[in-house]
Amino acid sequence: MSDQEIKSLVYNSEEIISSNVVEYTNRIIEAGITFDQELFTEYVQKALAEFGLLEVYNTIILPTLERIGILWLTNNIMPSQEHFISELVKQTIISNISFDNKIPDSAPSWLVFLPENEHHEIALLLAKYILKENNQKVIYLGQSVPKESLEIVRHHKKIDNILFS
């Protein structure tokens, strides 16, 4: 794919939310297509400073992932490009999850995981972020968790809620 074709695919947006949001989305897609982690980081950090993680997720990340998905389904990008951008999104969410906030002992606990053979954990990571920001205890098991292993967790920890996707 030529540079002009890439730019045409990236900048062809029918959604006009705000010029900044469109710019962030376009640049993040460009970063994914060209494997440019520095460009991704630059624009995501600007967006986070302007909007915060939840707003960035809703107004920039989701439309970006939708457009990346369309590009992938129409064979305009390779799986490696889609995986690259998805991994950077996951890293962004993880880096915003606080690991040092003191959660009260009385706080409800959540067991958070994806069932076996499910690997798309971006939304689950965001759920973890939201729960932690709301002072909830989270036991995050991640992706593709075998059903049998859940009993082990319940044996060792009191679980008030279960969240899976």
Question: Predicted segment positions?
Answer:
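C-terminal regulatory/effector modules of DNA-binding transcriptional regulators
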Residues: W72-S165
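Long amphipathic alpha-helical segments
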Residues: M1-N101
